[in-house]
């Protein structure tokens, strides 16, 4: 019933928008609408092919011209069309040429040529790039073609062929306008693919509009894409367990339009819940983070929606073997725009091979198991973004997101009682940007975020009910002021107030047991940083001051980011940062929350320390034409980590000890691009060790200590319709703790326990996987486009072990049973998407 009302609401909303909103261009006039007015005015009839004229825009309103002959002369002189009188009433309109050639020049606002801009036929995958003079030429075009101009750091331009002809020289001049960030901060415009860029501060940025294809994926999963970067790993194939430079997953902070997300995933971590159709770009920051960002001692991930109001309504619908979705962007008027999207799992109708593979991967070794007939799992997400442009200097944005995952598991005894687990996220945020004058900019943002995890578990012949709950509530207010001394030097300062509450509850009805833990932290932060950037240098130095009231602690966190570029080809950089975070995840017991999502959020207090990190890195990037080599060396120390948050499943899994982690590594990326092929090879060499003095005097390998990891990939662009991608990954096995073979169990007081050997002294076999995707453009007609994508994860269907642990043998207490966590099996997926 809830699903019915939810879908009914969104269907009604879409009908209202489609039926009530009409958007008109204020800078040009539709040729088709104008000639209809001319027909009425002069009592004539035009003959034409609709596809030839429907995209043409005119700079003048020809229906206001006084005579018919002047109108026909204007058409003949200012378009690619020929208007010919057949008789006194009928007029024929036809293209002058079957194939059209255009040329032009691209400039920035200062009149400087833009080199290497992409000039592409919209909806197709071929085009050209602009020369050093900003010049471009395209041939064999039709009058219905639309041409798109793209250059990283600048807003894209979309023009019909008819708008790109000058009656005087046949070469037009176009000016491209910069996006929000400064172009001088962009160092590599095409990093691996044309959808990725690397900024001078080391940030890797994914532009979703340019995203084409990634091996194994049929949808642009933003968090999955991050794993093609060196130093970004997921030891268990889950995006909820992404490790950046060996930091565990809760050490990554994810912001969606300034809103902190505590769980941005579906299927308990297998796929991203952030809809890519409304998200413009994703930024991944490994080191040298700006002082304005808090938390995330290992990385900061920024997901941003578009801040630019669109002139026309756009949207799309799509479906794959996991879910179906839709999105729409509606300009209500020239100042207000509403964007919304939804996605829903489709297993209510049928269980696809993809769903079964994901289900088996997610629920293996849990109370649910792999029997889909006794379970009912579903998920959905909703995104809403409202943009209000008060004037040219002031923009207000309101965002809302809801993420829901529900699982009901029915016991096989025929009873109506069901084990349940619900994982939800709700958040609303507001951001106000103001350009006070040419030198001063201000931003004020705030959000309310809620994360909840709830499970009901029946045991002992349905007589015992265990309820477990974990909840995080967070309110935040942030204000920043940026002062530009000149084009090169700026100073940014600000204040942030965070209030975070964490609840953990366990309730058992028989025997009666109730444990409730509540913690509230108020965090005051002040930050300031100076930034200098020119053609050669990028320098940013700042400091963040934090006060945590619950533990009465203050931290001072310096952040430094320096980069120097020689001749636009060679770059050297050095980065340093200190960071802290007061929330983290722990595992109390492996059967918590049905054994599905065993991690729960906790907060720093008198027993749980504040997590602190220090990281230093140096690197160099060399680029020459279409070749790229990127190198980085890093060293990171983290203190205050909990052993119960490291994912141990051995003799220390239930202990609450705090310790430290050190990680050192080398990251290498090689990339070669051509018009038809994109090739990349990444390699990471790293070592990550833990120290908990209460159990060991020396460091021992961390659970995510993957010493060697390498990825190789190819993207092939066969023609404007067909693209494929294939990649392979191979990495060394992760550590695990074996048992004492001579005596598998021992007595610990009144209990028999597994007799483990040395912690993480053994390693699993090497892991490897091959993924493949193919993308075919089914339809590109007028303003509608349709794509069919097919992808396979684990093409070779390799059955691999991701983790090994031991439990007591239920039939023989002197024996231990080995439990293996297996990788995702051969997983095909198919998607169909239509956009307009």
Regions found by a protein language model. Name each.
Residues 253, 281-290, 298-306, 313-365, ...:
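Predominantly transmembrane beta-strands of Gram-negative outer membrane beta-barrel pores used
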Residues 76, 129, 135, 153-155, ...:
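Periplasmic N-terminal accessory/gating domains of Gram-negative outer-membrane beta-barrel systems
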Residues 322-346, 363-406, 423-442, 485-491, ...:
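Transmembrane beta-barrel wall of Gram-negative outer-membrane proteins
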Residues 35-45, 79, 88-122, 148-156, ...:
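Short, acidic, small-residue-rich periplasmic hinge/interaction motif at the N-terminus
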Residues 393-442, 450-474, 514-517:
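Flexible loop and strand-edge segments within Gram-negative outer membrane beta-barrel domains
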Residues 635-637, 656-741:
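Gram-negative outer-membrane beta-barrel transporters
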Residues 349, 353, 721, 730-747, ...:
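C-terminal beta-signal and adjacent terminal beta-strands/loops
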Residues 421-427, 431-435, 470, 519-521, ...:
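Outer-membrane beta-barrel signature, preferentially recognizing the C-terminal barrel domain
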């Amino acid at each position: 019933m809830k699903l019915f009302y939810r879908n009914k609401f969104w269907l009604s909303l879409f009908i209202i928008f489609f039926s009530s909103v009409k958007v008109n261009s204020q800078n040009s006039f539709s040729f088709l609408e104008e000639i209809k007015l001319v027909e009425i005015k002069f009592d004539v009839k035009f003959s034409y092919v609709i596809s030839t004229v429907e995209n043409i825009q005119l700079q003048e309103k020809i229906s206001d011209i006084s005579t018919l002959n002047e109108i026909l002369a204007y058409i003949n002189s200012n378009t690619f069309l020929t208007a010919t009188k057949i008789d006194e009433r009928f007029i024929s309109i036809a293209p002058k040429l079957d194939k059209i050639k255009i040329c032009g020049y691209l400039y920035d606002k200062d009149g400087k040529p833009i080199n290497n801009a992409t000039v592409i036929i919209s909806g197709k995958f071929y085009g050209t790039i602009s020369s050093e003079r900003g010049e471009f030429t395209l041939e064999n075009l039709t009058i219905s073609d639309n041409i798109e101009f793209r250059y990283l750091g600048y807003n894209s331009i979309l023009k019909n062929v008819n708008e790109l002809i000058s009656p005087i020289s046949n070469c037009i001049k176009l000016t491209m306008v910069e996006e929000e960030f400064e172009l001088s901060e962009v160092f590599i415009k095409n990093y691996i693919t044309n959808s990725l860029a690397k900024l001078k501060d080391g940030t890797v940025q994914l532009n979703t509009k340019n995203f084409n294809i990634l091996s194994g994926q049929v949808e642009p999963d933003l968090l999955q894409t991050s794993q093609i970067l060196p130093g970004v790993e997921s030891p268990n194939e889950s995006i909820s367990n992404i490790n950046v430079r060996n930091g565990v997953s809760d050490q990554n902070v994810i912001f969606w339009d300034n809103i902190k997300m505590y769980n941005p995933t579906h299927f308990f971590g297998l796929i991203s819940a952030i809809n890519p159709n409304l998200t413009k770009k994703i930024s991944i920051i490994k080191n040298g983070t700006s002082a304005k960002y808090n938390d995330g001692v290992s990385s900061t991930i920024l997901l941003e929606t578009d801040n630019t109001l669109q002139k026309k309504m756009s949207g799309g619908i799509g479906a794959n073997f996991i879910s179906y979705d839709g999105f729409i962007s509606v300009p209500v008027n020239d100042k207000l725009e509403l964007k919304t999207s939804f996605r829903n799992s489709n297993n209510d109708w049928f269980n696809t091979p993809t769903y079964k593979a994901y289900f088996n991967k997610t629920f293996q070794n849990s109370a649910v198991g792999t029997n889909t007939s006794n379970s009912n799992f579903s998920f959905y997400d909703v995104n809403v973004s409202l943009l209000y442009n008060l004037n040219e200097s002031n923009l207000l944005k309101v965002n809302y997101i809801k993420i829901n995952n529900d699982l009901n598991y029915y016991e096989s005894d025929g009873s109506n009682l069901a084990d349940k687990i619900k994982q939800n996220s709700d958040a609303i945020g507001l951001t106000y940007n103001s350009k006070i004058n040419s030198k001063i900019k201000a931003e004020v943002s705030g959000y309310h975020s809620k994360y909840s995890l709830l499970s009901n578990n029946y045991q002992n012949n349905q007589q015992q009910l265990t309820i477990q709950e974990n909840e995080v509530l967070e309110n935040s207010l942030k204000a920043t002021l940026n002062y530009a001394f000149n084009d090169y030097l700026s100073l940014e300062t600000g204040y942030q107030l965070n209030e975070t509450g964490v609840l953990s509850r366990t309730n058992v009805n028989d025997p009666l047991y109730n444990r409730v833990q509540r913690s509230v932290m108020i965090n005051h932060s002040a930050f300031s940083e100076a930034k200098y950037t020119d053609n050669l240098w990028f320098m940013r130095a700042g400091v963040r001051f934090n006060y945590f009231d619950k533990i009465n602690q203050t931290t001072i966190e310096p952040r430094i980011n320096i980069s120097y570029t020689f001749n636009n080809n060679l770059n050297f950089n050095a980065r340093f940062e200190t960071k802290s975070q007061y929330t983290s995840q722990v595992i109390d017991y492996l059967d918590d929350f049905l054994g599905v999502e065993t991690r729960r959020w906790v907060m720093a207090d008198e027993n749980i320390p504040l997590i602190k990190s220090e990281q230093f890195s140096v690197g160099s990037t060399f680029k020459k034409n279409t070749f790229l080599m990127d190198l980085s060396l890093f060293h990171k120390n983290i203190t205050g980590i909990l052993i119960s948050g490291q994912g141990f499943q051995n003799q220390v899994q239930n202990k609450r000890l705090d310790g430290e982690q050190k990680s050192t590594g080398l990251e290498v990326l090689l990339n070669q691009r051509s018009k038809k092929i994109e090739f990349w090879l990444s390699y990471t060499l790293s070592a990550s060790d833990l120290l908990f003095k209460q159990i060991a005097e020396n460091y021992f390998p961390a659970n995510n200590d993957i010493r060697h990891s390498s990825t190789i990939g190819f993207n092939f662009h066969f023609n404007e319709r067909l693209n494929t991608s294939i990649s392979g990954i191979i990495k060394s096995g992760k550590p695990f703790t074996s048992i004492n073979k001579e005596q598998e169990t021992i007595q610990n007081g009144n209990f028999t326990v597994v007799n483990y050997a040395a912690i993480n002294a053994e390693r699993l076999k090497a892991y490897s996987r091959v993924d493949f995707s193919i993308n075919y453009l089914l339809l590109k007609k007028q303003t509608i486009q349709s794509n069919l994508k097919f992808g396979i994860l684990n093409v070779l269907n390799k059955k691999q072990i991701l983790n090994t642990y031991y439990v007591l043998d239920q039939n023989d207490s002197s024996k231990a049973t080995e439990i293996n966590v297996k990788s995702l099996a051969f997983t095909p997926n198919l998607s169909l998407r239509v956009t307009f």
